[in-house]
Amino acid sequence: MMSNDIFPNKFKAALAAQRIQIGCWSALANPISTEVLGLAGFDWLVLDGEHAPNDISTFIPQLMALKGSASAPVVRVPTNEPVIIKRLLDIGFYNFLIPFVETEEEAVRAVASTRYPPEGIRGVSVSHRANMFGTVPDYFAQSNKNITILVQIESQQGVDNVDAIAATEGVDGIFVGPSDLAAALGHLGNASHPEVQKTIQHIFARAKAHGKPCGILAPVEADARRYLEWGATFVAVGSDLGVFRSATQKLADAFKK
């Protein structure tokens, strides 16, 4: 029997303690690039299932690639749907980023999808990758309290309901989706617009008022540092796709121009 090194969830504990967590977005859907990210020293990595070409078959090798990494894998699910979340739990994810949460009811649904009864509605399989195929004896006793739920606020309705969402039991943090939020506020492609920035600051303040850490994606260093000053706890400061695109263009330009 293998030793159980999956509990407690250190990322969840770090968020609860309001310790700064610096992360990176993983969008290339490739185990090699994900493994490289896992060697860099980030506290957490988002494996994107909403906008990146990921599915169960691509997530599993990426989780394997991060097995020895100190970086906590966080999966952004394609949608807030219990069956999708159940399958991602079963393959070994413990940290979830739920996109486009607009109401308290949607936040409650997200939490319930990750919990076994009676606390939730997660379906039960006795042998899967997450419990090392039945070799973790305390898995069912430990699972519910070791799942991290981060919900994204990225619409006007979400902003309007941020207090109720942040107060939802089982929600571990509030994450701002700056691009969709900008679009919702009428500033598509311009997350730096003053109205968007003011709204981000408001979301951070409301999350803090409920004792919940807040996070954001900020690939521009000046933005990331400003959000940290505003009280953000978990910030993704770049993406593998962005770094790769920028570095390859810079290399080509050095010789072609």
Swiss-Prot record:
Co-factor binding details: Binds 1 Mg(2+) ion per subunit.
Residue(s) at site: Transition state stabilizer: R76
GO terms for MF: 2-dehydro-3-deoxyglucarate aldolase activity; magnesium ion binding
Pfam (any one): HpcH_HpaI
A biological process term (GO) from this entry: galactarate catabolic process
Keywords from the UniProt entry: Lyase, Magnesium, Metal-binding
Record carries keyword Chaperone: no
Subunit (UniProt): Homohexamer; trimer of dimers.
Record's protein name: 5-keto-4-deoxy-D-glucarate aldolase
Record organism: Citrobacter koseri (strain ATCC BAA-895 / CDC 4225-83 / SGSC4696)
Gene: garL
